[in-house]
């Protein structure tokens, strides 16, 4: 639900409560159990659901050919993933990070609209995402602990309050889009999105599980009116391949030992939808 208030002919504000739902499952992470504060709750426990709540506010202003908007959304406070309390920091807590942003749209011609916006995602507000992964020495110590059965050698066990995470930082997201209403039947759209990789190269190891390395993606699509009351929309998205790699070098008692981790990804997505007006 949304509550909106029109201040005057040009300015409006709105408020929405946000209800969150997450579902998670993990398989094949048995090797991570040796690094966990709760080894039985790391992997192969089926689906786990979490619910939560937050809030969002927004502003929209229209001034001739220009429209401007701004929004802010609180953290969405989620239930813990109790079945995976030994995987995510704070006993399975995995809140949705807060975000804020602003944008502008320009009606360049009667048919062409150009829009741009920027937003900030505050990953640092969620420990499961922002906690750093192990250094080389911490990993070698934990591996030694797993071999000899000494969990005290694991500096920040998975699932603990300071448990190892993905090391994500806050990021800025930039978007540019165009909308061209060719005629009453056809509308064409295109867009570009850029956001830096949210983690440093030395966090590549644990991000094998969540390789968010894509920085740029483009979209193109159209809407075709079939009848006065129905339409079909098609969108294609391509995310350009990006790579992150790092070689971890041990020091002190682990001098001479090393290992490497590499993350890479590209994406293709095609979406088709059909709409009806009642």
Annotate each language-model stretch with its function.
Residues 1-278:
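Outer-membrane beta-barrel porins/channels
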């Amino acid at each position: 639900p949304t509550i909106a208030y029109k201040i005057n002919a040009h300015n409006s504000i709105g408020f929405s409560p946000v209800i969150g739902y997450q579902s998670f499952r993990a398989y094949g992470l048995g090797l991570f159990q040796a690094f966990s504060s709760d080894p039985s709750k790391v992997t192969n426990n089926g689906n786990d659901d979490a619910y939560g709540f937050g809030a969002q506010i927004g502003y929209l202003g229209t001034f001739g050919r220009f429209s401007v908007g701004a929004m802010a959304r609180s953290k969405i406070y989620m239930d813990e993933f109790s079945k995976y309390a030994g995987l995510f920091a704070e006993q399975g807590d995995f809140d949705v990070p807060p975000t804020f942003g602003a944008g502008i749209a320009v009606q360049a011609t009667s048919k062409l609209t150009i829009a741009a916006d920027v937003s900030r995602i505050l990953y640092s507000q969620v420990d499961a995402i922002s906690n750093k992964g192990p250094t080389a020495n911490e990993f070698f110590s934990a591996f030694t602990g797993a071999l000899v059965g000494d969990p005290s050698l694991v500096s920040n066990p998975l699932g603990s309050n300071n448990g190892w995470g993905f090391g994500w930082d806050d990021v800025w997201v930039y978007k540019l889009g165009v909308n061209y209403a060719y005629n009453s039947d056809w509308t064409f759209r295109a867009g570009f999105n850029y956001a830096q990789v949210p983690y440093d190269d030395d966090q590549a190891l644990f991000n094998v599980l969540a390789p968010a390395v894509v920085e740029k993606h483009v979209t193109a699509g159209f809407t075709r009116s079939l009848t006065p009351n129905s339409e079909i929309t098609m969108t294609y998205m391509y995310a350009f391949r990006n790579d992150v790699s790092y070689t971890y070098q041990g020091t002190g008692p682990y001098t001479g030992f090393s290992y490497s981790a590499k993350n890479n990804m590209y994406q293709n997505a095609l979406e088709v939808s059909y709409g009806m007006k009642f």
